[in-house]
Amino acid sequence: MPTIQQLIRSSRKKITKKTKSPALKMCPQRRGVCSRVYTTTPKKPNSALRKVARIKLTSGFEVTAYIPGIGHNLQEHSVVLIRGGRVKDLPGVRYHIIRGTLDTSAVKDRIRSRSKYGVSK
C-alpha cells in the first residue's frame, strides 16, 4: 500500500489495453490492395496449404490476411476489405479478408453459414 505522500508524488498508472489488430486503427474494417497472393503451411501439428494475401492498406500498413472459404478469385492489384481476427495455426496472420465485397467473390455453392462467406440466397 502506498502512502498518501507517494500517491501525491506519482499517481496510479492506468492499465492500457493493447489492440490485437493495430493496422485497422480502431475501425471495424479497412480497404486495401493485394500486393501478393500465395499459399503457406501451418505450424505443427497441422498440415495444409492455407491461402493468404499480402495487402497494402489505406491506413499505410502492409499486412498478411487470410482468405477464408474454398476457392477464390484474388490476384495482384485486387481491392479487398479486411477485418480483424487471427488464424491460430498461421503465425503473423492477424486479419481476415471479407468475402463478397469489392473485388472478392463469394464462395461458390455455399449453403450453410452463408453470411460469413458473402453468399446471397
Swiss-Prot record:
SUPFAM superfamilies: Nucleic acid-binding proteins. Keywords: Chloroplast, Plastid, Ribonucleoprotein, Ribosomal protein, RNA-binding, rRNA-binding. GO terms for cellular component: chloroplast; small ribosomal subunit. PROSITE patterns: RIBOSOMAL_S12 (PS00055). It is found in: Plastid, Chloroplast. One of its GO terms (biological process) is translation. Pfam families: Ribosom_S12_S23. This is Small ribosomal subunit protein uS12c. It comes from Bigelowiella natans. The gene is rps12.
